A protein has these predicted regions:
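Charged, glycine-rich active-site and insertion segments that engage polyanionic ligands
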Residues: 1-50, 57, 74, 144-147, ...
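"Short basic amphipathic alpha-helical interaction patches in structured regions
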Residues: 99-100, 136, 163
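Conserved catalytic/switch belt of AAA+ P-loop NTPases
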Residues: 133-150
Length: 331
């Protein structure tokens, strides 16, 4: 059974949630805030199970719940009647009807078989203002047994009145070492590890997703080929590479991140940095070649240009032209 002990990192949040469970002083509303992949859902279910577990604290160990009482078994099978996960009608937003029918009108009904009733609202930042106002009424006067957990990717999108009535727990970015250790334990070859860790920026879920993604591997392969071969490219080659880089909107930023990390490594090597501390340790030959080919000034200008490209792409300029200019400059 997944419990607190299965969650990597987030020690502070877990400590405060455990404290709420074992002191029997849970708040009526929580906001778990952090980007997708940070483990908000896992944490919410672990907390819900721990709150509803029937075993005395001494028998629960590190997971927060015993794993074998009636409540834990129901929770494990996803059929606990007192753990309610909101499922909105539409995918893109949570409307007032969703909140009314699944939360507001439901809270008055006493827990089915526990001392508490837990509501989990994923993607709470997608609530419409009307939905938030409907929820607010419940948050203002909740029945004693309710605990509402809002999972949010950006708490600033929530009404201040909601924020003021909930305990907000921001998910913390994990250290690169923690993510790297986890990936190694999962059996990911070290070769791709460094790039995945750098791209994940402290988000374990994202790291796992990237490490399993064939698309990401292909993307890395393509951009690697461009960056190492750019000096021999013809104009036609550059056009083709730019078109390819611009093709998938959601991958453009990843490509720029790769280039940025790559040229930082080149700069680091050129400045006499230790090879063991490179991000792309396995590419040291190519990096050394680049360090020999480019001047300090040129590398700095390329790095600057990559940053400019990133802000240009955010303002929706022609992506193909942006990549073309960048690749020309690298050539
Ligand atoms: Zn239990």
């Amino acid at each position: 059974m997944m419990g607190f002990r299965d969650i990597i990192g987030q020690e502070q949040i877990i400590a405060s949630l455990k404290n709420a469970v074992f002191s029997a002083k849970a708040a009526h509303a929580y906001i778990f805030d952090g980007e997708k992949g940070m483990g908000k859902r896992t944490l919410a279910y672990a907390f819900a199970r721990a709150l509803l577990c029937e075993a005395p604290p001494g028998e629960r160990m590190d997971s927060g719940a015993c794993g074998c009482c009636h409540s834990c078994i129901m929770a494990e099978s996803g059929s606990h009647p007192d753990i309610i996960t909101l499922v909105p009608e539409k995918e893109s937003s949570i409307g007032v009807d969703d909140i009314r029918s699944q939360v507001v009108n439901d809270v008055a009904i006493k827990p089915y078989c526990s001392e508490r009733k837990i509501y989990i609202i994923p993607d709470a930042n997608l609530m419409t203002e009307a939905a938030e106002n409907a929820l607010l009424k419940t948050l203002e006067e909740p029945p004693a047994y309710t605990v509402i957990i809002l999972l949010s990717e950006n708490k600033d999108r929530l009404l201040p009145t909601i924020l003021s009535r909930a305990v907000c727990l921001p998910m913390r970015a994990l250290s690169n070492e923690a993510i790297s250790d986890y990936l190694v334990k999962k059996g990911l070859p070290e070769k791709d590890n460094a790039a995945v860790v750098s791209f994940a920026r402290g988000n374990l879920g994202k790291a796992v997703m990237l490490s399993e993604s064939e698309e990401f591997k292909e993307l890395l392969g393509n951009i690697r080929r461009t960056v190492t071969g750019v000096r021999d490219m013809t104009d036609t080659d550059i056009n083709a590479a730019a078109a390819e880089a611009a093709e998938k909107k959601e991958e453009r930023d990843n490509i720029l991140s790769f280039l940025l990390l790559w040229f930082r490594d080149v700069l680091f090597l050129k400045a006499g940095g230790d090879e063991d501390r490179l991000i792309f340790r396995d590419e040291v030959r190519e990096l050394n070649k680049a360090a020999g080919n480019y001047s300090f000034e040129k590398i700095n200008r390329i790095i600057q240009e990559i940053k400019t490209a990133r802000s240009r792409l955010k303002s929706n300029v022609n992506a193909e032209n942006t990549f073309e200019m960048l690749f020309m400059m690298m050539r």
